[in-house]
């Protein structure tokens, strides 16, 4: 009985995380209505946003900044520099994987400033999912997306992520802070990724980003 209860609890946690990442993916895709490639491959983008949580490595590797940022940087770099070698479906799926990691970096329980229990971790993420959903569905999310930043180089984009995470770690955070950082940073990184792809002349899917 104990084993079954634990299994169900873990399953419930996965469902909460899955819903949060898909919600964010749909919101980001909605910010690019003119991008026909993205709109045609929304499912691939959403899949990418949950893929890191269903891979075997999830069991042994926490999705926190200091443990996975090198990997995330590599994914961003490959999209910007070698994205022309991917078909549209793969491009958007891998873009979704990047956004998954960025969102996790600005989720309090995924950071060293969080000292709560596993139960508190899971409860926090459940409340975060509900609050994030309310912000998006009520049309409040746009308040947390700053004016689009123009990144001239890949290094500028990576430094943007590093600097915002440094600020994020200045103190213990809460759900309101997380919503602000997740929506703001994910939006800027998503836009910046395709600015750089477009600048490098990578495939049609990078041209209609606005």
Put a short name on every predicted segment.
Residues 1-97, 102-210:
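N-terminal leader/auxiliary helical segments
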């Amino acid at each position: 009985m104990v084993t079954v209860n634990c299994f169900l609890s873990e399953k419930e946690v996965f469902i909460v995380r899955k819903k949060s990442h898909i919600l964010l993916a749909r919101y980001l895709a909605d910010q690019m209505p003119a991008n026909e490639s993205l709109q045609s491959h929304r499912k691939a983008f959403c899949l990418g946003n949950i893929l890191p949580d269903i891979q075997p490595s999830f069991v042994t590797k926490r999705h926190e900044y200091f443990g996975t940022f090198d990997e995330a940087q590599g994914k961003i770099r490959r999209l910007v520099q070698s994205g022309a070698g991917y078909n549209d479906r793969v491009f958007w799926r891998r873009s979704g994987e990047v956004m998954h990691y960025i969102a996790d970096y600005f989720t309090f329980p995924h950071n060293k400033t969080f000292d709560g229990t596993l139960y508190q971790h899971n409860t926090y993420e459940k409340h975060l999912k509900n609050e994030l959903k309310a912000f998006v569905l009520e049309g409040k999310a746009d308040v947390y997306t700053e004016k689009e930043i123009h990144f001239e180089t890949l290094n500028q984009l990576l430094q943007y992520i590093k600097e915002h995470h440094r600020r994020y770690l200045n103190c213990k955070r809460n759900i309101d802070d997380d919503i602000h950082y997740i929506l703001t940073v994910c939006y800027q990184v998503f836009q910046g990724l395709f600015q750089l792809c477009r600048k490098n002349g990578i495939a049609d899917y990078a041209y209609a980003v606005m």
